[in-house]
């Protein structure tokens, strides 16, 4: 679907300890990010930076936390979902121990971001709009595929228990 791959499963992540420290050095990609933000604003769009949770080690979290420094400097909203208590459970919402959310985790993140964007921006709901019928159809297909694959995974989990 749209270049993505649906992967089902659960992981045994490494122990996760949240850090608030941030990387002091300029990171790869900061220049490009500044250019993207400037281009968005030139086109009348307001960018939003996000930090999507995964079982990151301390060094990775410091890089993620640096985004807040940049967001503050550039006056860009930053939604750091690492700091939303209870949003993602790395035991059940990731399909690998490194960084990828499974459909349950992705659904939680999508719902949270959708609500956040709705509260902070004037966005219209396009569901049911005939001009976006292909999105409704794609969602229906995704949900069917997800139910089948998640059901298969649950069956496998039951056999392994």
Give, region by region, the residue ranges found by the protein language model.
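Secreted/periplasmic serine-hydrolase-like ester/acetyl group-modifying domain
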Residues: 1-43, 128-161
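Acidic-and-aromatic substrate-binding clefts and catalytic sites of carbohydrate-active enzymes
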Residues: 23-29, 55-62
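C-terminal regions of proteins
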Residues: 59-140, 144-160
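N-terminal start-of-chain detector that recognizes signal peptides
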Residues: 19-21, 49-51, 71, 79-80
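Alpha-helical context
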Residues: 9-16, 25, 47, 82-89, ...
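Active-site segments of SGNH/GDSL-like serine hydrolases
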Residues: 34-60
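Short, local alpha-helical segments
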Residues: 17-21, 51-53, 90-99
């Amino acid at each position: 679907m749209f270049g993505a791959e649906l992967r089902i499963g659960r992981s045994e992540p490494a122990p996760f300890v949240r850090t608030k420290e941030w990387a002091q050095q300029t990171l790869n990609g900061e220049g490009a990010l500044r250019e993207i933000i400037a281009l968005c604003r030139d086109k009348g769009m307001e960018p939003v930076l996000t930090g999507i949770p995964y079982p990151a080690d301390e060094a990775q979290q410091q890089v993620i936390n640096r985004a807040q420094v940049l967001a503050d400097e550039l006056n860009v909203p930053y939604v750091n979902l690492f700091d939303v208590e209870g949003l993602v459970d790395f035991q059940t919402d990731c399909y690998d121990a490194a960084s990828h959310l499974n459909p349950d985790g992705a659904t939680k993140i999508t719902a949270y971001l959708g609500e956040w964007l709705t509260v902070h921006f004037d966005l219209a709901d396009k569901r049911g709009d005939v001009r976006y019928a292909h999105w409704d159809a794609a969602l229906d297909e995704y949900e069917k595929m997800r139910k089948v694959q998640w059901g298969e995974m649950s069956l496998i989990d039951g056999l392994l228990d």
